[in-house]
């Protein structure tokens, strides 16, 4: 086992005693020790909005107790494949329901949503192969649409596709190249999204040796392309050595394996980090490290991951994930809070059993996925609540003690997971591909029911249900202010911080509102030890984010979902250092997020940022996406009824305006068309809607008219009124959501489901208000 450094001293022990005393008798204490803990209000809201069964009119048909029963009973039906006794099934029902109802473990969202329902699609994500032929490519596009229609996400490697301009032997033409075909998959996602289901997420990966790698790296630079894709470059340790040596490396044509030129490794790496700084893409994955841990190399090479990057998969494999709530894996002794290793062990066993049953009960969207998933029986036991656990133990997140604890916990979880899978193998048999797997090699024979059973996945929505911190991330914020319709403020505080603040006598409404505004305790009048224990994501340097990811990676079979947070004024060099540290510390990939880099800065700030963080005055009109949504507003003018259509980008920002008068033709219509074109150009160039309204409002002509008590002075004034009403309506809706933009620097990027504010955590967009997560 990893040895935890003995850095504790009397002061730290006193902190632990204070925290324990503050938590005793609170709802936190009750939740940890209850067989049926009370759910937080936000947990109930998220469950009702996204998980509980409803009829066609949207009426809720079950409560959360019913949901846990539904899932447990459905998954327990798999017991009949191995033991058809009613007693065995009932024991499984009781075990599964108990571990979920105690909020000690939750499977991924599709299992909670769909188990026991008609869809019965229990996996979130899949990887599809993309072969180098037109028929195969568009067959995968069709499969992608089927998966997205069922609510799943998809990962692809486009590394097998011949480069742009290469000769196509069958036709004598030239190849379009990977980036062009990625656009076809992106368009298919848009079409399914328009069909009414939630947007499917995609991961696109290209190996660094592909001749089109530079075009791939810059493919999302303008912010208007591949908006349904995360992209990552697959690199190797050999490539990183050439980066260090400032050396060239070979490009290989995947069609025939021929030499296709050279690039300078350092220049390519610098371009990757610059684009990641600017847009958040591309990430990187260390493909050789991933394949070093491939449990089934006899079945092929791992080429891609799921959309969030933490689950490498063979072609046609699926995600089957769940997370243990570490915040519950504790007990209160006489003086302090301690880890309850026995409870952790039992929870791991129940988790492995439940996830193995998911494989048997899953209704996979494509037969090839069903076959491969049952052949490898891959599962992914992960964690959530690590930051809450650190608070209970009085440990600072960015400390060597926290890093050592992470390794210690993950090593125990990995070993317990292997043991539980081995015990299932004795009863049910090994997974079908076991004979030639890495688990049955000379000197390393271990019966396993499941392949690579440990993964740290995003816990976006299920962590809200469990009422705990996300995955291995630090606390994101300690206090939120929720604005109610009558303009009153409701403070929502982190329960651990609130308990300590009240116990120590420094709690006040004013403190919580100030904390919600600042987002950090850094300059606030609270005890120093409180500032140390209650660290938030933006208090922690990127270096410590990477070191924590690396600590968990050491005992994780697959990969680790983690966001490396940067302040908005971080430089390209800062991102480069993080990418390099991820390589040096053994990570299998890295996702970075610089505040504001994904908030549509071309649209919101009126300019782009330089490497030093200084805003440029140069404006460029964003390219129009293929699909936009909008609303049409009626304004009565002296020239007739005017219909103003305002279309928005996917973040809810006004993007273009079309105007039409009831009586077509003539100079009035021409003037309106000219105004609409110029307003659209201004919006696409980053000029704010408020600024446009200010310029157009009040312009008068000789035909004013009244519209619902408001004087409309002219055609341009009518456009200003419509645009103002749209913007005011959007803001009014946001008033019911979490006011986090001032804390997290996302530029107010709205949730696509409730218009609340999205945060970037675990490599995914996540809404604290309704529970939306791009990765669920």
Model-found features: residue ranges?
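Acidic/polar, glycine-rich intrinsically disordered N-terminal extensions of enzymes
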Residues: 1-122, 128, 269-278, 580, ...
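Active-site cavity-forming subdomains of large catalytic enzyme subunits
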Residues: 3-5, 14-15, 33, 123-344, ...
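Core structural elements
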Residues: 42-47, 99-113, 208, 352-358, ...
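Conserved phosphate/anionic-ligand binding catalytic regions in large, soluble enzymes, centered on
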Residues: 112-122, 127, 133-157, 205-207, ...
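Extended active-site and interfacial segments that coordinate phosphate-rich ligands
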Residues: 138-147, 162, 173-186, 219-233, ...
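Catalytic or ion-coupling anion/metal-binding cores of large enzyme and transporter domains
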Residues: 4-36, 54, 246, 250-266, ...
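Internal maturation/activation junctions in enzymes
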Residues: 141, 347-370, 374, 378, ...
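Catalytic alpha/beta core of large soluble enzyme barrels
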Residues: 310-312, 355-360, 430, 443-446, ...
């Amino acid at each position: 086992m990893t040895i935890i450094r003995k850095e504790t001293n009397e002061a730290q022990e006193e902190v632990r005693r204070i925290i324990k005393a503050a938590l005793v008798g609170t709802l936190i204490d009750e939740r940890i020790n209850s067989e049926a803990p009370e759910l937080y209000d936000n947990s109930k809201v998220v469950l009702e909005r996204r998980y509980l069964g409803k009829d066609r009119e949207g009426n809720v048909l079950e409560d959360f107790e019913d949901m846990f029963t539904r899932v447990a009973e459905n998954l327990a039906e798999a017991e009949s494949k191995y033991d058809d006794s009613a007693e065995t099934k009932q024991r499984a029902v009781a075990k599964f329901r108990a571990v979920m109802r105690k909020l000690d473990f939750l499977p991924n969202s599709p299992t909670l949503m769909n188990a026991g329902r008609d869809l019965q699609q229990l996996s979130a994500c899949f990887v599809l192969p993309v072969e180098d032929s037109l028929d195969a490519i568009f067959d995968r596009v069709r499969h992608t649409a089927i998966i997205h229609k069922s609510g799943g996400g998809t990962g692809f490697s486009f590394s097998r596709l011949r480069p742009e301009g290469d000769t196509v032997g069958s036709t004598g033409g030239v190849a379009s190249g990977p980036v062009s075909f990625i656009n076809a998959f992106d368009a298919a996602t848009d079409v399914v999204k328009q069909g009414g289901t939630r947007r499917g997420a995609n991961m696109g990966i290209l190996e660094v040796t592909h001749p089109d790698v530079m075009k791939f790296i810059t493919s999302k630079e303008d912010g208007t392309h591949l908006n349904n894709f995360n992209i990552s470059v697959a690199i190797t340790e050999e490539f990183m050595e050439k980066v260090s040596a400032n050396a060239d490396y070979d490009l290989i044509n995947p069609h025939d394996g021929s030499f296709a030129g050279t690039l300078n490794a350092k220049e390519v790496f610098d371009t990757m980090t610059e684009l990641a700084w600017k847009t958040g893409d591309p990430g990187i994955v260390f493909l050789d490290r991933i394949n070093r841990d491939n449990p089934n190399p006899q079945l092929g090479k791992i080429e891609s991951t799921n959309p969030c990057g933490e689950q490498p998969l063979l072609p046609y494999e699926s995600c089957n994930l769940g997370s243990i709530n570490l915040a519950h894996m504790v007990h209160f002794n006489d003086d302090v809070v301690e880890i309850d290793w026995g409870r952790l062990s039992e929870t791991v066993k129940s988790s492995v059993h439940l996830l193995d049953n998911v494989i048997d009960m899953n209704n996979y969207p494509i037969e090839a996925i069903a076959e491969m998933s049952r052949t490898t029986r891959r599962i992914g036991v992960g964690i959530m609540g690590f930051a809450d656990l650190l608070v209970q133990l009085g440990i600072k997140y960015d400390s060597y003690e926290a890093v050592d604890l992470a390794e210690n916990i993950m090593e125990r979880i990995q070993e317990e997971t292997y043991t539980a899978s081995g015990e299932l193998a004795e009863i049910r048999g090994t997974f079908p591909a076991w004979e030639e797997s890495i688990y049955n090699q000379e000197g390393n024979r271990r019966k396993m029911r499941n392949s690579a059973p440990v993964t740290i996945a995003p816990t976006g929505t299920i962590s809200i249900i469990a009422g705990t911190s996300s995955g291995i991330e630090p606390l994101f914020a300690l206090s939120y202010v929720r604005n109610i319709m009558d303009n009153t403020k409701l403070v929502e505080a982190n329960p651990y911080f609130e308990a300590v603040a009240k116990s120590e006598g420094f709690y006040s409404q004013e403190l919580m509102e100030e904390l919600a505004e600042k987002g950090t305790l850094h300059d606030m009048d609270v005890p120093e030890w409180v500032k140390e224990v209650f660290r938030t994501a933006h208090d922690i340097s990127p270096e410590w984010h990477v070191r924590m990811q690396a600590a968990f990676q050491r005992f994780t079979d697959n990969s680790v979902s983690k966001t490396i947070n940067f302040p908005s004024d971080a430089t390209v060099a800062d991102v480069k250092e993080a990418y390099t540290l991820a390589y040096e510390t053994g990570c299998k990939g890295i996702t970075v997020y610089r505040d504001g880099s994904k908030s549509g800065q071309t649209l919101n700030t009126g300019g782009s940022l330089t490497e030093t963080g200084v805003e440029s005055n140069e404006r460029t009109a964003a390219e129009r996406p293929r699909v936009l949504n909008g609303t049409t507003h009626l304004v009565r003018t002296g020239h007739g009824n005017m219909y103003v259509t305002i279309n928005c980008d996917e973040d809810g920002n006004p993007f273009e305006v079309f105007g039409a008068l009831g009586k077509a033709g003539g100079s009035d219509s021409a003037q309106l068309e000219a105004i609409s074109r110029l307003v659209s150009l201004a919006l696409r160039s980053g000029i704010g809607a408020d600024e446009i309204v200010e310029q157009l409002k009040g312009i008068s002509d000789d035909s004013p008219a009244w519209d619902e008590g408001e004087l409309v002075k002219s055609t341009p004034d009518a456009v200003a009124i419509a645009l103002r009403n749209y913007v005011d309506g959007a803001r009014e809706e946001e008033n019911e959501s979490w006011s986090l933009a001032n804390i997290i620097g996302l530029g107010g990027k709205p949730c696509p489901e409730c218009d609340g504010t999205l945060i970037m955590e675990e490599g995914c967009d996540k809404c604290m208000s309704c529970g939306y997560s791009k990765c669920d």
